[in-house]
Amino acid sequence: MGINETTYRYRVQDKYEFGKYEEPIQYQLALLYEMPISRNYFEMWMAYHLTNTILFSPAVELRTVSYDDARTVFERLVRMIRQRSTIREIVNAHMISQENWRRFRSPEDNTREMMEIFLGRFDDAEVPLAAQACQNWSLERVKVNGKKVYQLVIGDEPNTTPVDLLGTTVVECRDFYDAVSNHPDLIPTVVSNIVNLFFGDNPSVDKQSIINDIVEDNPETFNAIFMNLLFSKAFLVSVERPKAFEELFFSCADKIDWYAGSSFFKYLNRSRVGLWAVNLNNTKQAAMTYKLGRPVAVPLDTLSFAYYHKAVRERM
C-alpha cells in the first residue's frame, strides 16, 4: 500500500522543533513516528536499521563527520532500496562515498575496515596491497564557502602497479571497491550482520542456521533479506529479545493514542546532554551515531537500562 509520503514530510517539518545541528537524525525519527505502515514506511524502516549497524553507520560521533552526512547516507539507502538496487550496488555506492571516508579516513584504515566489515576478512597482509590501490584517495580539511570541512580528495597520481587481491587483479581504488562488492563473501557477511541485529545474543536460536537458510535463497536485495528474516519461524515464534527504544516506545504510543510534543524529538536524540536527561545517548541507543554501529544487543547494564526505563515511564 502506497501513501503520499510528501504530506508526512511537510507535516513533520511543520509540527516539530529540531536541534540546529542534529536535525537530520531527529527529523528521520519523527518521520518514522508519524508515517503509517506502508511500503514507503518499510523501505525507510530498513534504511534506518541499516544506518544503525556497523555496515552503514554515519558515525556522527566523529569530529570528521557532520550531521548532514547522516541525512545523505539515510536518503541514499532509501533511494537505492526503492530503485530496487542490488545489495552489491548499494554497498559499492556507500564505500566510494565521501561519507564513508569521513568515517574511515586513510587508505590503510578505509580499506582494512571495508574488508573486515563487508567480507569478514581480517588478514593484515592484504591491507598494504589495498592501501596501495587507494594511495591517491585521502580525506583532507579544506575551506568551502568560508567554512572548513573534511572532503574526500582523489589525487591525479593513481596506482599503476597491479596487485593480486581478493581473488582478482586490482590496480586503482575503484577496482578495490568493485572487488569487495563483487566478492562471494559479501552477501553472507551482510546477512550475518542483519541476523545479529534482530537476534542478538539469544542462545535459544541457531543463528548460523538462519544465516545459511537466507544465503541459500541467494538474496539480491535488502528487501529479500529483511522479508525472509521477518517472516521466518525463528523470528515470529522463537526469538525473545529486549526491544530497541523506538520499537517499544513508538508501538506503545500508537496503542494508547499518545502524541509527541513539538520538542520531543529535539531532546530524544541529542548529542550533548546531562546525566539527568531522558535521551537515546544515555541509553546507549543513539541513532546513526557510533563508528561501529549500535551494540548488537540492547544495552542492559544498570545505568543504560535505568535511563531506558525512565524514558518510557516519564516521556509517555
What are these regions (language model features)?
Residues 54, 183-316:
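Flexible, low-complexity segments enriched for small/polar residues
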Residues 31-37, 55-64, 73-80, 99-101, ...:
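Second-shell loop/turn segments in exported
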Residues 1-82, 98-103:
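N-terminal accessory alpha/beta regions
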Residues 59-66, 101-107, 141-149, 204-207, ...:
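Short, solvent-exposed loop/turn and secondary-structure capping segments
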Residues 109-112, 118, 129-202:
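Nucleic-acid-contacting surfaces of polymerase cores and analogous helical-repeat interfaces
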Residues 84-142:
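Activity-critical C-terminal alpha-helical subdomain
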Residues 44, 48-59, 83, 93-100, ...:
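Glycine-rich, acidic and aromatic/proline-enriched surface loops and short helix-turn segments
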Residues 42-44, 83-90, 123-125, 186-192, ...:
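Loop/turn elements at helix/coil->beta-strand transitions in domains of secreted/extracellular proteins
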